[in-house]
Amino acid sequence: GNVQSIIDRLNVDALEISSGAETISEDYLLITYTDGYGDVPSEVEEFLSGNNSHLKGVIVSGDQGYGEAYCKAGDVIAKQYNVPCLYKVENDGTEEDIDEIRKIIENQ
């Protein structure tokens, strides 16, 4: 999907959240997509319920065709876990988006 494409283009170490049962014990940035009409994907909700203490920020993918729900999962996570929503990207992003996201990651 779009998030996998972003990760592949960033060429960074990443933990793929497929079930939500994954664990992480170091600081991390979450890159996720927005599900449905502004929802946090269920496996991401489950992952965050047990792995939010090291969460430092969220980068979110969305589709502007959804209007006000565009990238809303990032806003929901930011509010729920009191972390910044660092970047919103349309689908899998442009090269400029990837460069900006890379800078954000390098500055964490």
Where do the PLM segments sit?
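N-terminal beta1-alpha1 ligand-phosphate binding loop
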Residues: 1-11
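FMN-binding flavodoxin-like domain, especially the glycine-rich phosphate-binding loop
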Residues: 9, 13, 17-18, 25-108
